[in-house]
């Protein structure tokens, strides 16, 4: 299904709906689809945090993808580790399906669950690929990962978006997997917000050939730590600046 992406128009074909993923993030997803296509005759996909459905579209298009489960806590106002707030109150599930129909995409293989994966009953299909892009807090990301383990196959991949924001959750995941003696490989894509954990037969893949340049785990953790500290400081400053507007003739910054 997926060939090497050379032009933006080619990328837009697979991602016709707006999403919060960059060009490099999208290419990472397409390369993962290519990896699955090379190793499996069919596969199932689970996504946590679908928003408008923008990251679901290449999986809808892929004939080898037989089942899709979209899990999301809709109609809520959420925040992340940076102190950023996101309002999803006006993004109902039906708006996502409307986006699919507008782009001529069939939705018969998609099922949705409005809530958290921890409340999903352990029954039915197992999944080859999970994309965790829900609430970007360390607690929620770690929780999503732990409960995702109930729904994955022995040979599977779990992808994380906004990896710099949830780097502490990733470090906790390492501790858990090492304690439980579960073999795995981890990569963080350079110049992208994507990272992934590979299980089973995918552990020994040549990731540089599949995804391109990979960032060292040490560099990833160090840069993420600095990013979060700077983001938190900037957000605190914004709050103080907003409060200062109430006071006339006062210097707007407070340290």
Where are these regions (language model features)?
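Polybasic, low-complexity association/targeting segments
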Residues: 1-5
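S-adenosylmethionine/decaboxylated-SAM
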Residues: 7-14, 34-255
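Conserved SAM-binding loop and adjacent beta-strand
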Residues: 14-29
